[in-house]
Regions:
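GHKL (Bergerat-fold) ATPase N-terminal catalytic module, capturing the glycine-rich phosphate-binding loop
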Residues: 1-161
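N-terminal assembly/transducer modules of large multi-domain enzymes
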Residues: 38, 42, 147-190
């Protein structure tokens, strides 16, 4: 097993027991994951769905991305209070022609939706010319989740890419499309 770099201080199955709907229901999982892109000020979200088990699910956006410090302060905090720390409106990378957009996120739960598909997933997030790539795992010891691998490299632009190998559940394209259409297609800037 890889060395743990960072860890929270909760029981191994804390997320599964506490946030059962986001780690068990595919439609809720995708809704939460795309809501994270919305909250990051993304105008585009690309989703790749697997056709069979063990293929990757990829969700990539052009949102604001995170620095390593922001990742530590936001992603690694259980039940992160988004409104208290970032306000009720989202951050755009460019305000040009953009209306204010209320954030969906409140309780720091949606990021754990990747666990609906596997006990490990990758987060690649970039801004200010630096990309941080993390391998997250729930089997990293006594913590709720851990970063078991962290790589840093150069990358222009801004955004976040989540990827996970579909092992536990395989999302159906029609179901995902319908769920996301109900929640997000009303905004022409998204």
């Amino acid at each position: 097993m890889a060395e743990t770099i960072r860890k929270s201080t909760f029981e191994k199955d804390f997320i599964e027991r506490t946030y059962s709907s986001v780690v068990s229901d595919v439609t809720i999982a995708f809704s939460e994951l795309v809501a994270n892109s919305w909250d990051a000020g993304a105008t585009t979200v690309n989703i790749t769905l697997p056709s069979k088990a063990n293929e990757k699910i990829i969700i990539e956006d052009n949102g604001s991305g995170m620095t390593d410090d922001e990742f530590q302060e936001r992603w690694m905090v259980i039940a992160y209070n988004r409104v208290a720390h970032q306000g009720q409106y989202i951050e755009y990378t460019s305000l040009q022609g953009k209306a204010k957009r209320l954030a969906y996120g409140r309780n720091g739960i949606g990021r754990h939706s990747m666990l609906c598909f596997n006990d490990q997933y990758e987060v690649e997030t970039w801004r200010n010319g630096t990309c941080n790539k993390y391998l997250i795992s729930v089997d990293g010891g006594d913590s709720a989740f851990s970063v078991i691998e962290h790589n840093i490299f150069s990358r222009e632009g801004h955004g976040t890419k989540l990827s996970v190998k579909a092992v536990k559940k395989i999302p159906q394209k029609k179901e995902v499309k319908q769920t996301l259409g109900y929640r997000f297609l009303f905004d022409p800037e998204f």
